[in-house]
Amino acid sequence: KAYFEVAGIILRENVHMGVIYIQGEQLWGEKLPRLATIYLLVLKLIYDEQMQTASSSSHVVTTLGAVNGKAGEFHVLKSLPSITEMRRTIALLKKYQIIEPLDVLEELNEATRLVIYPCIHTVLLGDDIRELLATFSEEDQIGDEAAIQSTLEDMPE
């Protein structure tokens, strides 16, 4: 702990969630692609929903179809992402040990099972997620309205 404190980093342990993580003002990770951000938000919601039901396990299993379906419910995905984009996103989230695919990534489909680890709690709080999902929806609506307005302006009289 003292080693990290010299650099302004705090080592945190949450026994209840079963995670150890570092925190500090100087810590900035890489910028996540849009799909990774959407998946992260949706995975957190799925995790919270499934943990509300009496579960003795600390991790949750879901499918890629459920993740894409939930993203569709919140209108944050206009269409199904490409297989390549989904593979990259799953690999990125696996790199940070947020999820673990139970099936081979080369055979990616809607039935592909994903384990969501408890460390998803350290990424965002539930209320933050709902705000971000609303922001994604507003951005899409503004984009759609701008496209409609642009189309209307381009129409001959």
Protein language model regions, located:
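Short amphipathic alpha-helical interaction segments
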Residues: 1, 78-95
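Eukaryotic partner-binding/assembly regions in large regulatory complexes
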Residues: 1-26
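A short, conserved structural fragment
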Residues: 5-13, 90, 94-106
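Accessory beta->alpha helical hairpin/"wing" motif in late/C-terminal subdomains of nucleic-acid enzymes
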Residues: 19-24, 100-127
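Positively charged, polyanion-binding regions of nucleic-acid-associated proteins
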Residues: 33-58
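Short acidic, hydrophobic short linear motifs in intrinsically disordered regions
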Residues: 54-72
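Short, amphipathic alpha-helical interaction segments positioned at domain boundaries
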Residues: 115-152
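Long, compositionally biased intrinsically disordered regions
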Residues: 155-157
